Amino acid sequence: MAVKIRLKRMGSKKAPFYRVVVADSRSPRDGRFIEEIGYYNPVAQPAVVKIDTDKAVQWILNGAAPTDTVRNLLSKEGVMAKVHETKYGK
């Protein structure tokens, strides 16, 4: 089972917000997911990102692959640096 960390679209038409979820890569974008690890609201000024860093690091170390957009969000939150530090040391 290939697991990805990706965005699940929520909200109304023209006013989206997203949940950052861990899901099987074969499931639909807004379908079944394994765990919710945060959210992203691009409509708010400034955009709001809240991610549980411990869960995100654990999933990435266990082999979950973040999508490009989620990878950028994780980098801005400092999660990717934490993963690199945990995996390879300082």
Curated annotation (Swiss-Prot):
One of its GO terms (cellular component) is small ribosomal subunit. One of its GO terms (molecular function) is structural constituent of ribosome. Pfam families: Ribosomal_S16 (PF00886). The keyword RNA-binding does not apply. This is Small ribosomal subunit protein bS16. Belongs to the bacterial ribosomal protein bS16 family. Keywords: Ribonucleoprotein, Ribosomal protein. SUPFAM superfamilies: Ribosomal protein S16 (SSF54565). The lineage of its organism: Bacteria, Bacillati, Bacillota, Bacilli, Bacillales. PANTHER family: 30S RIBOSOMAL PROTEIN S16 (PTHR12919), SMALL RIBOSOMAL SUBUNIT PROTEIN BS16M (PTHR12919:SF20). GO terms for biological process: translation. It comes from the Bacteria. The gene is rpsP.
